[in-house]
A protein has these predicted regions:
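Aromatic-anchored, charged helix-turn/loop surface patch used as a conserved interaction hotspot
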Residues: 1-24, 28-114, 163-178
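C-terminal non-catalytic interaction appendages of large macromolecular assemblies
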Residues: 97-178
Length: 178
């Protein structure tokens, strides 16, 4: 991980931005993290990533959410609309959502309907850190979160995005465990 951190620190800004965009689609988060380089340790990188994320607001969070495929949607059904980091982000999304890819037609239909209801209610896609969750678990979470008020749900979705971003930073650095 330390060698990967050294490489990230040494990359030209545009290349570092492209790699970090695969971790989080909020451009101000990416720019803020690139501006803070070099990082002395992985822990320092993670702390900066969290600090920057928590300093952002609604529009930044929505920008990050918009770069995700919906839960249950395959990479073929949606190519992430990013000019950089697309192939890495698409692959990571597919891996993270693997629990939603192998399920019954009923679960797929219920996830699709839940996604539509969620987008209609909140104005953005359902964001959940899907790693390690089954489709049934994600559906239950989606159904529970549909009951939230808009403010509470945005806060929850932003925290889920932060968790996704942390996992993707770990992948970027070559870590296999949290």
């Amino acid at each position: 991980m330390e060698n990967a951190l050294k490489r990230l620190n040494a990359l030209p800004a545009t290349e570092a931005e492209a790699e970090l965009l695969a971790c989080c689609g909020a451009s101000r988060w990416v720019q803020g993290l690139v501006a803070r380089r070099p990082f002395g340790s992985v822990a320092e990188l993670f702390a900066a990533a969290d600090e920057i994320w928590r300093s952002l607001g609604r529009e930044d969070w929505l920008e990050a959410f918009a770069r995700h495929p919906q839960i249950g949607e395959t990479a073929v059904e949606k190519q992430i609309k990013s000019e950089t980091g697309q192939h890495i982000s698409s692959r990571w999304s597919a891996e993270e959502q693997s629990g939603a890819q192998r399920n019954s037609a009923d679960i797929v239909a219920r996830l699709a309907e839940g996604n539509r209801a969620y987008r209609q209610r909140f104005g953005y896609i359902f964001i959940v850190c899907a790693t390690g969750k089954t489709a049934e678990e994600m559906l239950a979470i989606l159904e529970r979160r549909l009951q939230n008020d808009a403010s509470a749900e945005l806060t929850i979705a932003a925290e889920e995005q932060r968790r996704i971003t942390r996992l993707r930073l770990e992948k970027l650095l070559g870590a296999e465990t949290r």
